[in-house]
Amino acid sequence: MALVSAVPLDSRLCLCRTLFGLTHELKAIRRTIPNLGMCRGGKSIAPSMSMSSTTFVSSEDGVPRRIGGHHSNLWDDDSIDSLSTSYEAPSYRERADRLIGEVKDMFHLISVEDGVSTSPLNDLHHRLWMVDSVERLGIDRHFKNETNAGLDHVYSYWTEKGIGRGRESGATDLNSTALGLRTLRLHGYMVSSHVLDHFKNEKGQFTCSAIQTEGEIRDVLNLFRASLIAFPGEKIMDAAEIFSTMYLKDALQKIPPSGLSQEIEYLLEFGWHTNLPRMETRMYIDVFGEDTTFETPYLIRERLLELAKLEFNIFHSLVKRELQSLSRWWKDYGFPEITFSRHRHVEYYTLAACIANDPKHSAFRLGFAKICHMVTILDDIYDTFGTMEELELLTAAFKRWDPSSIECLPDYMKGVYMAVYDNINETAREAQKIQGWDIVSYARKSWEALFDAHMQEAKWISSGYLPTFEEYLENGKVSFGSRLTTLEPMLTLGFPLPPRILQEIDFPSNFNELICAILRLRGDTQCYKADRARGEEASSVSCYMKDHPGITEEDAVNQINALVNNLTKELNSELLRPDSGVPISYKKFYFDIWRVFHYGYKYRDGFSVASIEIKNLVTITVVETVPL
Protein backbone atom coordinates (compact mmCIF):
# COMPACT_ATOMS: atom_id res chain seq x y z
CA MET A 1 0.00 0.00 0.00
CA ALA A 2 1.10 3.52 -0.68
CA LEU A 3 1.88 6.67 1.22
CA VAL A 4 -1.04 9.06 0.88
CA SER A 5 0.32 12.47 0.07
CA ALA A 6 -1.29 15.53 -1.35
CA VAL A 7 1.96 16.92 -2.71
CA PRO A 8 1.04 18.69 -5.95
CA LEU A 9 2.80 17.73 -9.15
CA ASP A 10 3.12 19.73 -12.29
CA SER A 11 0.05 18.54 -14.18
CA ARG A 12 0.77 20.18 -17.49
CA LEU A 13 0.66 17.94 -20.52
CA CYS A 14 3.76 15.77 -20.88
CA LEU A 15 5.35 16.05 -24.30
CA CYS A 16 6.13 12.54 -25.48
CA ARG A 17 9.47 12.30 -27.20
CA THR A 18 10.99 9.70 -29.43
CA LEU A 19 13.19 6.85 -28.22
CA PHE A 20 16.25 8.79 -29.38
CA GLY A 21 18.35 9.84 -26.42
CA LEU A 22 16.69 7.63 -23.81
CA THR A 23 19.91 5.77 -23.07
CA HIS A 24 21.74 9.01 -22.34
CA GLU A 25 18.79 10.19 -20.28
CA LEU A 26 18.74 7.07 -18.11
CA LYS A 27 22.37 7.70 -17.15
CA ALA A 28 21.39 11.17 -16.02
CA ILE A 29 18.39 9.77 -14.15
CA ARG A 30 20.66 7.62 -12.00
CA ARG A 31 22.43 10.75 -10.82
CA THR A 32 19.19 12.45 -9.81
CA ILE A 33 17.29 9.67 -8.01
CA PRO A 34 16.53 10.83 -4.46
CA ASN A 35 19.29 9.54 -2.20
CA LEU A 36 18.22 8.63 1.31
CA GLY A 37 21.54 7.36 2.56
CA MET A 38 20.88 3.63 2.94
CA CYS A 39 24.24 2.86 1.27
CA ARG A 40 27.55 4.64 1.50
CA GLY A 41 30.09 4.66 -1.29
CA GLY A 42 28.57 1.60 -2.90
CA LYS A 43 29.15 -0.47 0.25
CA SER A 44 26.51 -2.07 2.43
CA ILE A 45 26.09 -0.69 5.91
CA ALA A 46 25.14 -2.86 8.89
CA PRO A 47 21.63 -4.25 8.43
CA SER A 48 18.93 -2.60 10.49
CA MET A 49 16.47 -5.00 12.13
CA SER A 50 14.03 -2.34 13.25
CA MET A 51 10.75 -2.60 11.40
CA SER A 52 8.58 -1.12 14.13
CA SER A 53 8.11 2.46 13.07
CA THR A 54 7.75 4.63 10.02
CA THR A 55 10.68 6.83 9.10
CA PHE A 56 9.87 10.16 7.47
CA VAL A 57 12.57 11.81 5.40
CA SER A 58 12.86 14.81 3.17
CA SER A 59 14.31 13.76 -0.15
CA GLU A 60 16.35 15.89 -2.51
CA ASP A 61 13.19 17.00 -4.33
CA GLY A 62 11.89 18.51 -1.08
CA VAL A 63 8.94 16.11 -0.78
CA PRO A 64 8.45 14.52 2.66
CA ARG A 65 8.39 10.76 2.17
CA ARG A 66 8.26 7.56 4.15
CA ILE A 67 10.81 4.76 3.98
CA GLY A 68 10.47 1.30 5.44
CA GLY A 69 13.79 1.09 7.27
CA HIS A 70 14.90 -1.95 5.29
CA HIS A 71 18.50 -3.10 5.52
CA SER A 72 20.69 -2.68 2.46
CA ASN A 73 21.95 -5.18 -0.10
CA LEU A 74 23.97 -7.92 1.61
CA TRP A 75 25.80 -9.22 -1.46
CA ASP A 76 28.13 -6.80 -3.24
CA ASP A 77 30.31 -7.49 -6.28
CA ASP A 78 33.18 -8.70 -4.10
CA SER A 79 30.92 -11.37 -2.62
CA ILE A 80 29.85 -12.55 -6.07
CA ASP A 81 33.34 -12.41 -7.58
CA SER A 82 34.69 -14.56 -4.74
CA LEU A 83 32.44 -17.50 -5.64
CA SER A 84 34.22 -20.70 -6.58
CA THR A 85 34.66 -21.80 -10.19
CA SER A 86 37.03 -24.65 -9.37
CA TYR A 87 34.61 -27.25 -10.72
CA GLU A 88 34.16 -25.84 -14.22
CA ALA A 89 37.00 -27.94 -15.66
CA PRO A 90 35.70 -30.39 -18.31
CA SER A 91 37.10 -33.34 -16.34
CA TYR A 92 34.45 -32.89 -13.63
CA ARG A 93 31.63 -32.90 -16.18
CA GLU A 94 33.12 -35.98 -17.85
CA ARG A 95 33.32 -37.77 -14.50
CA ALA A 96 29.71 -36.87 -13.71
CA ASP A 97 28.54 -38.16 -17.08
CA ARG A 98 30.31 -41.48 -16.50
CA LEU A 99 28.64 -41.78 -13.10
CA ILE A 100 25.24 -41.07 -14.65
CA GLY A 101 25.79 -44.03 -16.96
CA GLU A 102 26.81 -46.26 -14.05
CA VAL A 103 23.75 -45.30 -12.00
CA LYS A 104 21.49 -46.01 -14.98
CA ASP A 105 23.05 -49.47 -15.14
CA MET A 106 22.26 -49.90 -11.44
CA PHE A 107 18.63 -48.97 -12.07
CA HIS A 108 18.60 -51.62 -14.80
CA LEU A 109 20.02 -54.28 -12.48
CA ILE A 110 17.27 -53.56 -9.97
CA SER A 111 14.66 -53.93 -12.70
CA VAL A 112 15.91 -57.41 -13.65
CA GLU A 113 13.83 -60.14 -12.02
CA ASP A 114 16.00 -61.85 -9.39
CA GLY A 115 18.89 -59.55 -10.26
CA VAL A 116 22.13 -59.74 -8.33
CA SER A 117 21.52 -56.46 -6.47
CA THR A 118 18.00 -57.21 -5.29
CA SER A 119 15.60 -60.04 -4.53
CA PRO A 120 11.84 -60.63 -4.64
CA LEU A 121 11.86 -60.08 -0.88
CA ASN A 122 12.98 -56.43 -1.08
CA ASP A 123 12.78 -55.33 -4.72
CA LEU A 124 9.80 -52.97 -4.25
CA HIS A 125 11.46 -51.09 -1.41
CA HIS A 126 14.75 -51.04 -3.32
CA ARG A 127 13.08 -49.37 -6.33
CA LEU A 128 11.37 -46.81 -4.11
CA TRP A 129 14.62 -46.13 -2.27
CA MET A 130 16.47 -45.51 -5.53
CA VAL A 131 13.83 -43.08 -6.80
CA ASP A 132 13.64 -41.29 -3.45
CA SER A 133 17.42 -41.08 -3.20
CA VAL A 134 18.08 -39.54 -6.62
CA GLU A 135 15.31 -37.00 -5.98
CA ARG A 136 16.60 -35.96 -2.58
CA LEU A 137 20.18 -35.86 -3.84
CA GLY A 138 19.14 -33.44 -6.60
CA ILE A 139 20.14 -35.68 -9.53
CA ASP A 140 16.72 -37.05 -10.56
CA ARG A 141 16.64 -35.10 -13.84
CA HIS A 142 19.11 -37.63 -15.25
CA PHE A 143 16.90 -40.63 -14.49
CA LYS A 144 13.37 -39.78 -15.62
CA ASN A 145 12.87 -42.97 -17.64
CA GLU A 146 14.32 -45.15 -14.89
CA THR A 147 12.11 -43.46 -12.31
CA ASN A 148 8.95 -43.99 -14.35
CA ALA A 149 9.77 -47.64 -14.98
CA GLY A 150 10.50 -48.27 -11.31
CA LEU A 151 7.30 -46.64 -10.10
CA ASP A 152 5.21 -48.43 -12.70
CA HIS A 153 6.59 -51.70 -11.33
CA VAL A 154 5.82 -50.74 -7.72
CA TYR A 155 2.32 -49.59 -8.63
CA SER A 156 1.59 -52.90 -10.34
CA TYR A 157 1.93 -54.60 -6.93
CA TRP A 158 0.04 -51.92 -4.98
CA THR A 159 -2.97 -53.19 -3.01
CA GLU A 160 -5.62 -51.71 -0.75
CA LYS A 161 -3.34 -52.65 2.14
CA GLY A 162 -0.21 -51.16 0.59
CA ILE A 163 2.86 -53.22 -0.26
CA GLY A 164 5.52 -55.34 1.36
CA ARG A 165 9.23 -54.79 0.96
CA GLY A 166 9.24 -57.11 -2.04
CA ARG A 167 6.80 -58.65 -4.46
CA GLU A 168 7.11 -61.99 -2.63
CA SER A 169 7.57 -60.73 0.93
CA GLY A 170 4.04 -61.68 1.99
CA ALA A 171 3.23 -59.15 4.72
CA THR A 172 2.74 -55.44 4.13
CA ASP A 173 5.42 -53.12 5.46
CA LEU A 174 4.90 -49.66 6.97
CA ASN A 175 8.14 -48.18 5.67
CA SER A 176 7.60 -49.38 2.09
CA THR A 177 3.90 -48.49 2.11
CA ALA A 178 4.48 -44.98 3.51
CA LEU A 179 7.35 -44.29 1.11
CA GLY A 180 5.29 -45.73 -1.74
CA LEU A 181 2.23 -43.64 -0.86
CA ARG A 182 4.30 -40.47 -0.83
CA THR A 183 6.35 -41.17 -3.95
CA LEU A 184 3.50 -42.52 -6.07
CA ARG A 185 1.28 -39.55 -5.19
CA LEU A 186 3.99 -37.07 -6.08
CA HIS A 187 4.27 -38.70 -9.50
CA GLY A 188 0.54 -38.65 -10.23
CA TYR A 189 -0.47 -42.22 -9.41
CA MET A 190 -3.91 -42.62 -7.87
CA VAL A 191 -3.28 -44.18 -4.44
CA SER A 192 -5.56 -43.96 -1.42
CA SER A 193 -4.39 -42.95 2.03
CA HIS A 194 -6.64 -45.67 3.47
CA VAL A 195 -3.71 -48.07 3.13
CA LEU A 196 -2.48 -46.54 6.40
CA ASP A 197 -5.57 -47.84 8.24
CA HIS A 198 -4.02 -51.29 8.15
CA PHE A 199 -1.18 -50.13 10.39
CA LYS A 200 -3.48 -49.08 13.27
CA ASN A 201 -4.51 -51.25 16.19
CA GLU A 202 -8.00 -52.32 17.22
CA LYS A 203 -8.46 -48.96 18.95
CA GLY A 204 -7.79 -47.13 15.71
CA GLN A 205 -4.40 -45.83 16.81
CA PHE A 206 -0.93 -46.04 15.33
CA THR A 207 1.29 -48.03 17.65
CA CYS A 208 4.97 -48.40 18.32
CA SER A 209 7.19 -50.71 20.31
CA ALA A 210 8.49 -49.96 23.77
CA ILE A 211 12.06 -49.73 22.44
CA GLN A 212 12.65 -47.32 19.57
CA THR A 213 14.98 -49.06 17.14
CA GLU A 214 16.59 -47.27 14.23
CA GLY A 215 14.46 -49.32 11.86
CA GLU A 216 11.22 -48.31 13.56
CA ILE A 217 12.29 -44.67 13.71
CA ARG A 218 12.89 -44.69 9.96
CA ASP A 219 9.50 -46.35 9.43
CA VAL A 220 7.82 -43.51 11.30
CA LEU A 221 9.96 -40.90 9.54
CA ASN A 222 8.60 -42.06 6.18
CA LEU A 223 5.10 -42.11 7.67
CA PHE A 224 5.60 -38.45 8.61
CA ARG A 225 6.82 -37.59 5.11
CA ALA A 226 3.81 -39.33 3.58
CA SER A 227 1.33 -37.60 5.91
CA LEU A 228 2.29 -34.19 4.51
CA ILE A 229 1.00 -35.10 1.03
CA ALA A 230 -2.56 -34.85 2.33
CA PHE A 231 -5.76 -34.01 0.48
CA PRO A 232 -8.88 -32.35 1.98
CA GLY A 233 -10.88 -34.62 4.29
CA GLU A 234 -8.16 -37.23 4.79
CA LYS A 235 -8.41 -37.71 8.55
CA ILE A 236 -6.06 -40.66 8.43
CA MET A 237 -3.31 -38.36 7.16
CA ASP A 238 -3.98 -35.88 9.96
CA ALA A 239 -3.76 -38.71 12.49
CA ALA A 240 -0.55 -39.98 10.90
CA GLU A 241 1.03 -36.53 11.05
CA ILE A 242 0.11 -36.02 14.70
CA PHE A 243 1.36 -39.47 15.73
CA SER A 244 4.59 -39.34 13.73
CA THR A 245 5.42 -35.81 14.86
CA MET A 246 5.07 -36.74 18.53
CA TYR A 247 7.00 -39.97 18.03
CA LEU A 248 9.90 -38.30 16.22
CA LYS A 249 10.17 -35.47 18.73
CA ASP A 250 10.34 -38.07 21.49
CA ALA A 251 12.95 -40.05 19.57
CA LEU A 252 15.14 -36.96 19.25
CA GLN A 253 15.35 -36.82 23.04
CA LYS A 254 16.65 -40.39 23.20
CA ILE A 255 18.99 -40.96 20.27
CA PRO A 256 22.53 -39.54 20.08
CA PRO A 257 23.47 -36.85 17.55
CA SER A 258 23.82 -38.55 14.19
CA GLY A 259 22.82 -38.37 10.56
CA LEU A 260 19.44 -39.79 11.53
CA SER A 261 18.82 -37.13 14.18
CA GLN A 262 19.92 -34.42 11.73
CA GLU A 263 17.49 -35.73 9.11
CA ILE A 264 14.62 -35.85 11.62
CA GLU A 265 15.28 -32.31 12.82
CA TYR A 266 15.40 -31.04 9.25
CA LEU A 267 12.16 -32.72 8.16
CA LEU A 268 10.27 -31.67 11.28
CA GLU A 269 11.42 -28.11 10.64
CA PHE A 270 10.68 -27.83 6.91
CA GLY A 271 8.24 -30.63 6.15
CA TRP A 272 7.32 -30.54 2.48
CA HIS A 273 5.83 -27.13 1.76
CA THR A 274 8.84 -25.09 2.90
CA ASN A 275 11.41 -27.71 1.94
CA LEU A 276 13.36 -26.40 -1.05
CA PRO A 277 14.94 -29.14 -3.20
CA ARG A 278 18.52 -27.80 -3.31
CA MET A 279 18.40 -27.01 0.41
CA GLU A 280 17.33 -30.60 1.13
CA THR A 281 20.04 -31.90 -1.19
CA ARG A 282 22.68 -30.06 0.83
CA MET A 283 21.39 -31.67 4.03
CA TYR A 284 20.94 -35.12 2.51
CA ILE A 285 24.47 -35.20 1.11
CA ASP A 286 25.73 -34.99 4.69
CA VAL A 287 23.54 -37.80 6.05
CA PHE A 288 23.27 -40.09 3.02
CA GLY A 289 24.66 -43.53 3.53
CA GLU A 290 24.13 -43.69 7.28
CA ASP A 291 20.93 -45.75 6.97
CA THR A 292 22.09 -49.18 8.16
CA THR A 293 18.60 -50.68 8.24
CA PHE A 294 18.38 -51.28 4.49
CA GLU A 295 21.02 -53.43 2.88
CA THR A 296 21.97 -51.61 -0.28
CA PRO A 297 25.29 -52.48 -1.94
CA TYR A 298 28.01 -50.02 -0.92
CA LEU A 299 28.86 -49.35 -4.56
CA ILE A 300 25.39 -47.95 -5.27
CA ARG A 301 25.53 -45.56 -2.31
CA GLU A 302 29.07 -44.51 -3.18
CA ARG A 303 28.21 -43.74 -6.81
CA LEU A 304 25.03 -41.85 -5.95
CA LEU A 305 26.80 -39.73 -3.35
CA GLU A 306 29.76 -38.92 -5.60
CA LEU A 307 27.46 -37.91 -8.45
CA ALA A 308 25.37 -35.72 -6.13
CA LYS A 309 28.46 -33.91 -4.84
CA LEU A 310 29.82 -33.37 -8.34
CA GLU A 311 26.54 -32.00 -9.68
CA PHE A 312 26.16 -29.74 -6.64
CA ASN A 313 29.64 -28.27 -7.12
CA ILE A 314 29.62 -28.04 -10.93
CA PHE A 315 26.54 -25.85 -10.63
CA HIS A 316 28.61 -23.25 -8.71
CA SER A 317 30.59 -22.19 -11.77
CA LEU A 318 27.32 -21.45 -13.55
CA VAL A 319 26.02 -19.61 -10.48
CA LYS A 320 28.94 -17.19 -10.52
CA ARG A 321 28.43 -16.24 -14.17
CA GLU A 322 24.69 -15.84 -13.75
CA LEU A 323 25.03 -13.72 -10.62
CA GLN A 324 27.59 -11.50 -12.34
CA SER A 325 25.12 -11.03 -15.20
CA LEU A 326 22.35 -10.26 -12.72
CA SER A 327 24.54 -7.74 -10.89
CA ARG A 328 25.34 -5.93 -14.17
CA TRP A 329 21.62 -5.73 -14.96
CA TRP A 330 20.93 -4.39 -11.46
CA LYS A 331 23.50 -1.62 -11.89
CA ASP A 332 22.69 -0.81 -15.53
CA TYR A 333 19.15 0.25 -14.59
CA GLY A 334 20.32 2.35 -11.67
CA PHE A 335 18.80 0.20 -8.94
CA PRO A 336 21.65 0.78 -6.44
CA GLU A 337 20.64 4.46 -6.33
CA ILE A 338 17.09 3.55 -5.25
CA THR A 339 18.18 3.48 -1.64
CA PHE A 340 14.72 3.55 -0.04
CA SER A 341 13.90 0.05 -1.26
CA ARG A 342 14.83 -3.56 -0.56
CA HIS A 343 17.45 -5.07 -2.85
CA ARG A 344 17.10 -8.84 -2.76
CA HIS A 345 18.08 -9.86 -6.30
CA VAL A 346 20.77 -12.28 -5.08
CA GLU A 347 18.35 -13.83 -2.61
CA TYR A 348 15.69 -14.23 -5.30
CA TYR A 349 18.23 -15.84 -7.61
CA THR A 350 19.15 -18.26 -4.84
CA LEU A 351 15.53 -19.23 -4.34
CA ALA A 352 15.21 -19.89 -8.07
CA ALA A 353 18.38 -21.99 -8.00
CA CYS A 354 16.93 -24.01 -5.14
CA ILE A 355 14.05 -25.21 -7.32
CA ALA A 356 15.66 -25.18 -10.79
CA ASN A 357 19.27 -26.35 -10.85
CA ASP A 358 19.26 -27.71 -14.39
CA PRO A 359 21.92 -25.71 -16.31
CA LYS A 360 19.54 -25.23 -19.24
CA HIS A 361 17.12 -23.29 -17.01
CA SER A 362 19.33 -20.20 -16.79
CA ALA A 363 16.64 -17.97 -18.33
CA PHE A 364 14.20 -19.13 -15.65
CA ARG A 365 16.58 -18.38 -12.77
CA LEU A 366 17.59 -14.95 -14.04
CA GLY A 367 14.06 -14.09 -15.13
CA PHE A 368 12.64 -15.02 -11.75
CA ALA A 369 15.27 -12.96 -9.91
CA LYS A 370 14.73 -9.89 -12.11
CA ILE A 371 10.95 -9.94 -11.93
CA CYS A 372 10.92 -10.52 -8.18
CA HIS A 373 13.33 -7.64 -7.72
CA MET A 374 11.23 -5.28 -9.85
CA VAL A 375 8.03 -6.33 -8.09
CA THR A 376 9.74 -5.64 -4.75
CA ILE A 377 10.90 -2.18 -5.87
CA LEU A 378 7.39 -1.37 -7.08
CA ASP A 379 5.94 -2.66 -3.83
CA ASP A 380 8.14 -0.27 -1.86
CA ILE A 381 7.26 2.61 -4.18
CA TYR A 382 3.53 1.99 -3.79
CA ASP A 383 3.72 1.08 -0.10
CA THR A 384 5.79 3.93 1.23
CA PHE A 385 7.83 6.19 -1.01
CA GLY A 386 5.53 7.34 -3.78
CA THR A 387 2.86 10.01 -3.50
CA MET A 388 -0.63 9.27 -4.77
CA GLU A 389 -0.15 11.60 -7.72
CA GLU A 390 3.13 9.92 -8.67
CA LEU A 391 1.56 6.48 -8.43
CA GLU A 392 -1.28 7.50 -10.71
CA LEU A 393 1.25 8.78 -13.25
CA LEU A 394 3.25 5.54 -13.08
CA THR A 395 0.17 3.36 -13.50
CA ALA A 396 -1.08 5.40 -16.44
CA ALA A 397 2.37 5.49 -18.07
CA PHE A 398 2.68 1.74 -17.94
CA LYS A 399 -0.72 1.25 -19.53
CA ARG A 400 0.31 3.52 -22.41
CA TRP A 401 3.20 1.10 -23.07
CA ASP A 402 5.42 3.72 -24.63
CA PRO A 403 8.97 4.38 -23.36
CA SER A 404 8.56 8.08 -24.05
CA SER A 405 5.98 8.04 -21.24
CA ILE A 406 8.83 8.25 -18.75
CA GLU A 407 8.95 11.99 -19.49
CA CYS A 408 5.84 12.25 -17.31
CA LEU A 409 7.43 10.46 -14.35
CA PRO A 410 9.56 11.59 -11.41
CA ASP A 411 13.21 10.75 -11.95
CA TYR A 412 13.32 7.88 -9.45
CA MET A 413 10.55 6.04 -11.35
CA LYS A 414 12.08 6.29 -14.82
CA GLY A 415 14.69 3.58 -14.48
CA VAL A 416 12.16 1.25 -12.88
CA TYR A 417 9.72 1.79 -15.73
CA MET A 418 12.39 1.06 -18.34
CA ALA A 419 13.53 -2.05 -16.47
CA VAL A 420 9.99 -3.45 -16.52
CA TYR A 421 9.47 -2.46 -20.16
CA ASP A 422 12.75 -3.95 -21.36
CA ASN A 423 12.37 -7.09 -19.29
CA ILE A 424 8.94 -7.88 -20.73
CA ASN A 425 10.30 -7.52 -24.26
CA GLU A 426 13.43 -9.52 -23.48
CA THR A 427 11.40 -12.33 -21.90
CA ALA A 428 9.00 -12.28 -24.83
CA ARG A 429 11.86 -12.84 -27.26
CA GLU A 430 13.10 -15.82 -25.25
CA ALA A 431 9.62 -17.22 -24.78
CA GLN A 432 8.69 -16.94 -28.45
CA LYS A 433 11.51 -19.31 -29.38
CA ILE A 434 9.85 -21.95 -27.21
CA GLN A 435 6.16 -21.09 -27.24
CA GLY A 436 5.86 -19.96 -30.85
CA TRP A 437 3.70 -16.95 -30.01
CA ASP A 438 4.24 -13.39 -28.80
CA ILE A 439 3.59 -13.16 -25.05
CA VAL A 440 3.90 -9.36 -24.76
CA SER A 441 0.18 -8.61 -24.55
CA TYR A 442 -0.33 -11.55 -22.19
CA ALA A 443 2.45 -10.32 -19.90
CA ARG A 444 1.28 -6.71 -20.07
CA LYS A 445 -2.17 -7.68 -18.81
CA SER A 446 -0.69 -9.39 -15.77
CA TRP A 447 1.50 -6.35 -15.02
CA GLU A 448 -1.46 -4.00 -15.47
CA ALA A 449 -3.45 -6.08 -13.00
CA LEU A 450 -0.62 -5.67 -10.48
CA PHE A 451 -0.50 -1.88 -10.93
CA ASP A 452 -4.29 -1.67 -10.57
CA ALA A 453 -4.25 -3.77 -7.40
CA HIS A 454 -1.58 -1.54 -5.86
CA MET A 455 -3.59 1.53 -6.78
CA GLN A 456 -6.68 0.04 -5.14
CA GLU A 457 -4.77 -0.40 -1.90
CA ALA A 458 -3.46 3.17 -2.16
CA LYS A 459 -7.02 4.45 -2.54
CA TRP A 460 -8.11 2.52 0.55
CA ILE A 461 -5.41 4.28 2.56
CA SER A 462 -6.22 7.64 1.02
CA SER A 463 -9.88 7.38 2.03
CA GLY A 464 -9.26 5.63 5.35
CA TYR A 465 -11.38 2.71 4.17
CA LEU A 466 -10.86 -0.72 5.74
CA PRO A 467 -12.25 -3.34 3.34
CA THR A 468 -13.97 -6.57 4.26
CA PHE A 469 -11.85 -9.70 4.46
CA GLU A 470 -13.26 -11.01 1.17
CA GLU A 471 -12.75 -7.69 -0.60
CA TYR A 472 -9.19 -7.40 0.69
CA LEU A 473 -8.27 -10.95 -0.26
CA GLU A 474 -9.61 -10.66 -3.80
CA ASN A 475 -7.38 -7.65 -4.40
CA GLY A 476 -4.50 -9.03 -2.35
CA LYS A 477 -4.23 -12.18 -4.42
CA VAL A 478 -3.18 -9.92 -7.29
CA SER A 479 -1.15 -7.31 -5.42
CA PHE A 480 1.10 -9.98 -3.89
CA GLY A 481 2.60 -10.38 -7.35
CA SER A 482 3.06 -14.16 -7.37
CA ARG A 483 1.36 -14.51 -10.75
CA LEU A 484 3.95 -12.26 -12.36
CA THR A 485 6.91 -13.91 -10.72
CA THR A 486 5.66 -17.27 -11.97
CA LEU A 487 4.21 -16.58 -15.40
CA GLU A 488 7.04 -14.98 -17.35
CA PRO A 489 9.90 -17.21 -16.11
CA MET A 490 7.72 -20.29 -16.70
CA LEU A 491 7.29 -19.36 -20.34
CA THR A 492 11.07 -19.50 -20.86
CA LEU A 493 11.34 -23.13 -19.75
CA GLY A 494 11.99 -25.74 -22.37
CA PHE A 495 8.45 -27.01 -22.78
CA PRO A 496 5.45 -25.47 -24.57
CA LEU A 497 2.56 -23.97 -22.62
CA PRO A 498 -0.38 -23.84 -25.04
CA PRO A 499 -3.45 -21.74 -24.11
CA ARG A 500 -5.33 -24.83 -22.87
CA ILE A 501 -2.68 -25.55 -20.26
CA LEU A 502 -2.20 -21.89 -19.34
CA GLN A 503 -5.91 -21.68 -18.53
CA GLU A 504 -5.47 -24.57 -16.10
CA ILE A 505 -2.45 -23.22 -14.24
CA ASP A 506 -2.44 -19.43 -14.67
CA PHE A 507 -4.58 -16.95 -12.74
CA PRO A 508 -7.56 -17.11 -12.21
CA SER A 509 -7.61 -20.93 -12.41
CA ASN A 510 -8.42 -22.66 -9.13
CA PHE A 511 -4.84 -23.92 -8.92
CA ASN A 512 -3.38 -20.43 -9.22
CA GLU A 513 -6.07 -18.82 -7.06
CA LEU A 514 -5.09 -21.15 -4.23
CA ILE A 515 -1.42 -20.27 -4.65
CA CYS A 516 -2.13 -16.53 -4.63
CA ALA A 517 -4.53 -16.72 -1.67
CA ILE A 518 -2.21 -18.80 0.50
CA LEU A 519 0.76 -16.54 -0.14
CA ARG A 520 -1.21 -13.37 0.57
CA LEU A 521 -2.54 -14.81 3.83
CA ARG A 522 0.78 -16.30 4.92
CA GLY A 523 2.62 -13.10 4.08
CA ASP A 524 0.13 -11.00 6.02
CA THR A 525 0.44 -13.06 9.19
CA GLN A 526 4.19 -12.34 9.18
CA CYS A 527 4.07 -8.74 7.96
CA TYR A 528 0.94 -7.09 9.35
CA LYS A 529 2.54 -5.59 12.46
CA ALA A 530 5.41 -3.99 10.55
CA ASP A 531 3.01 -2.84 7.82
CA ARG A 532 0.69 -1.31 10.40
CA ALA A 533 3.62 0.53 11.98
CA ARG A 534 4.30 2.05 8.55
CA GLY A 535 0.73 3.28 8.29
CA GLU A 536 -0.67 0.41 6.22
CA GLU A 537 -3.71 -0.63 8.21
CA ALA A 538 -5.41 -3.02 5.79
CA SER A 539 -4.25 -6.62 6.08
CA SER A 540 -6.02 -9.95 6.19
CA VAL A 541 -5.69 -9.83 9.98
CA SER A 542 -7.26 -6.39 10.47
CA CYS A 543 -9.95 -7.08 7.87
CA TYR A 544 -10.83 -10.40 9.51
CA MET A 545 -11.12 -8.62 12.86
CA LYS A 546 -13.42 -6.04 11.26
CA ASP A 547 -15.69 -8.82 9.97
CA HIS A 548 -15.70 -10.54 13.39
CA PRO A 549 -16.14 -7.85 16.07
CA GLY A 550 -14.75 -8.82 19.45
CA ILE A 551 -12.21 -11.32 18.18
CA THR A 552 -8.67 -10.87 19.45
CA GLU A 553 -5.71 -10.32 17.16
CA GLU A 554 -4.21 -13.63 18.24
CA ASP A 555 -7.41 -15.51 17.45
CA ALA A 556 -7.63 -13.81 14.06
CA VAL A 557 -4.10 -14.95 13.21
CA ASN A 558 -4.92 -18.49 14.36
CA GLN A 559 -8.06 -18.55 12.21
CA ILE A 560 -6.13 -17.37 9.18
CA ASN A 561 -3.41 -19.97 9.77
CA ALA A 562 -6.09 -22.67 9.97
CA LEU A 563 -7.52 -21.40 6.68
CA VAL A 564 -4.05 -21.54 5.14
CA ASN A 565 -3.67 -25.16 6.24
CA ASN A 566 -6.99 -26.12 4.66
CA LEU A 567 -6.21 -24.27 1.44
CA THR A 568 -2.82 -25.98 1.33
CA LYS A 569 -4.48 -29.40 1.28
CA GLU A 570 -6.69 -28.20 -1.57
CA LEU A 571 -3.55 -27.08 -3.37
CA ASN A 572 -1.99 -30.52 -2.85
CA SER A 573 -5.03 -32.07 -4.49
CA GLU A 574 -5.02 -29.60 -7.39
CA LEU A 575 -1.35 -30.27 -8.01
CA LEU A 576 -1.49 -34.06 -7.89
CA ARG A 577 -4.92 -35.11 -9.10
CA PRO A 578 -4.43 -37.38 -12.12
CA ASP A 579 -7.60 -36.22 -13.92
CA SER A 580 -6.60 -32.57 -14.32
CA GLY A 581 -5.48 -32.94 -17.94
CA VAL A 582 -2.28 -31.02 -17.19
CA PRO A 583 0.96 -32.93 -16.55
CA ILE A 584 2.19 -32.61 -12.98
CA SER A 585 5.59 -31.52 -14.31
CA TYR A 586 3.96 -28.37 -15.73
CA LYS A 587 2.25 -27.49 -12.47
CA LYS A 588 5.27 -28.46 -10.41
CA PHE A 589 7.22 -25.32 -11.30
CA TYR A 590 4.29 -23.14 -10.21
CA PHE A 591 4.04 -25.15 -7.01
CA ASP A 592 7.78 -24.92 -6.34
CA ILE A 593 7.69 -21.14 -6.72
CA TRP A 594 4.87 -21.18 -4.17
CA ARG A 595 7.16 -23.21 -1.87
CA VAL A 596 9.90 -20.62 -2.35
CA PHE A 597 7.70 -17.80 -1.06
CA HIS A 598 6.23 -20.04 1.63
CA TYR A 599 9.78 -20.63 2.86
CA GLY A 600 10.45 -16.89 2.83
CA TYR A 601 7.57 -16.29 5.25
CA LYS A 602 8.21 -19.28 7.50
CA TYR A 603 9.77 -17.36 10.39
CA ARG A 604 9.24 -13.71 9.53
CA ASP A 605 9.06 -11.50 6.44
CA GLY A 606 12.27 -12.96 5.11
CA PHE A 607 12.26 -10.62 2.12
CA SER A 608 12.44 -7.55 4.35
CA VAL A 609 14.76 -9.09 6.93
CA ALA A 610 16.97 -11.19 4.67
CA SER A 611 19.99 -11.24 6.97
CA ILE A 612 19.05 -14.36 8.91
CA GLU A 613 17.51 -17.51 7.38
CA ILE A 614 17.70 -16.51 3.73
CA LYS A 615 21.28 -15.27 4.14
CA ASN A 616 22.17 -18.71 5.47
CA LEU A 617 20.33 -20.28 2.54
CA VAL A 618 22.44 -18.27 0.08
CA THR A 619 25.58 -19.41 1.88
CA ILE A 620 24.87 -23.14 1.91
CA THR A 621 23.30 -23.46 -1.54
CA VAL A 622 25.15 -21.06 -3.87
CA VAL A 623 28.24 -19.80 -2.02
CA GLU A 624 29.79 -22.90 -0.47
CA THR A 625 30.74 -26.09 -2.28
CA VAL A 626 30.68 -29.52 -0.65
CA PRO A 627 33.88 -31.51 -0.06
CA LEU A 628 34.24 -34.47 -2.40
Curated annotation (Swiss-Prot):
Pathway in which the depicted protein is active: Terpene metabolism; oleoresin biosynthesis; Secondary metabolite biosynthesis; terpenoid biosynthesis
The protein's required cofactors: Mg(2+); Mn(2+)
Free-text remark on how the cofactor is bound: Binds 3 Mg(2+) or Mn(2+) ions per subunit.
A GO BP entry: terpenoid biosynthetic process
Record-listed Mg(2+) 3 binding positions: D531
UniProt GO cellular component terms: chloroplast
E.C. code: 4.2.3.-
Binding site for Mg(2+) 2: D379, D383
Residues annotated to bind Mg(2+) 1: D379, D383
Function: Monoterpene synthase (TPS) involved in the biosynthesis of monoterpene natural products included in conifer oleoresin secretions and volatile emissions; these compounds contribute to biotic and abiotic stress defense against herbivores and pathogens.
Homology family: Belongs to the terpene synthase family. Tpsd subfamily.
Domain notes: The Asp-Asp-Xaa-Xaa-Asp/Glu (DDXXD/E) motif is important for the catalytic activity, presumably through binding to Mg(2+).
Name listed for the protein in its UniProt record: Monoterpene synthase like 2, chloroplastic
